[in-house]
Amino acid sequence: MESHEGIDVVLVTGLSGAGRGTAAKVLEDLGWYVADNLPPELIARMVDLGLAAGSRITQLAVVMDVRSKGFTGDLDWVRNELATRNIAPRVLFMEASDDILVRRYEQNRRSHPLQGTQTLAEGIAAERAMLAPVRAAADLVIDTSTLPVPALRESIERAFGGETVAYTNVTVESFGYKYGLPMDADTVMDVRFLPNPHWVDELRPHSGQHPDVRDYVLGQPGALEFLDTYHRLLDVVIDGYRREGKRYMTVAIGCTGGKHRSVAIAEALAERLEGGDGLTVRVLHRDLGRE
């Protein structure tokens, strides 16, 4: 699907419970600025901000649903208003079968926005009828009835990702076991199998960021082999996370106090990961300076 000059605009709409929120999250991961249920006039103002010189907003996604008063009229107004700026917003319409929507609402124990005193099925039917013209005019319709989230993500990335890479954000975190495991770690590796620089008098005062400590740690038997092997393993894990739609990962490296070995290994591992496609890597030394 083609992009538009100046600012690219996608209006995300569809049946309640069909996955609008998930679609918005995917677009956000792709670098889109996402706004939820803006009044129509604010959508136009947001676009004007995006068109202004120096603006960082080049891709705007707005989630719209039937809770907005005069929804179909609002949508038409937005499209006509943006047309005066030579912008043709694309419409992404999310839908699912009635039985799937009923099941989702029952599982979440929520009421449908159009249900009122009606049955859930009647509320869904009313919304479907109301949105029929919108669906007919949509640029892309995605049926999530049998679509798992990774496949939904792939469909949206294919349609709206353009040349944008959906980055996986990896945090490599060193820590000391004596202070406890990091609560946010997705995977933990123990590097206490390496000799401890703490017992080398001239290295003890320095951290794993010091060149002498780093050289000492990486020069130990098994250190580089560990780094190479773990790097290859993480490549497999990261690819799997991407397929499952997980964009954030914390890799924890632990030693006794979080000062020498884990710091040096975390730094070296991050350097290897930084060469990977579609990765943003940062290093966090949780317990450095804590001793």
Swiss-Prot record:
Protein name as catalogued: Nucleotide-binding protein MSMEG_3079/MSMEI_3001
Taxonomy, top ranks, is:
Bacteria, Bacillati, Actinomycetota, Actinomycetes, Mycobacteriales
Keyword Lyase in the entry? The reply is: no
What's in the keyword line of the UniProt record?
A: ATP-binding, GTP-binding, Nucleotide-binding
Q: HAMAP family given for it? A: RapZ_like (MF_00636)
Family of the protein in this entry = Belongs to the RapZ-like family.
Signal peptide, first to last residue: none
UniProt-listed InterPro entries:
P-loop_NTPase (IPR027417), RapZ-like (IPR005337), RapZ-like_N (IPR053930), RapZ_C (IPR053931)
Name the domain of life this protein comes from: Bacteria
The UniProt annotation places ATP binding at G14, L15, S16, G17, A18, G19, R20, G21
Which Gene Ontology terms cover its molecular function? ATP binding; GTP binding
Locate the residues binding GTP: D65, V66, R67, S68
Functional note:
Displays ATPase and GTPase activities.
* Keyword ATP-binding appears in the UniProt entry: yes
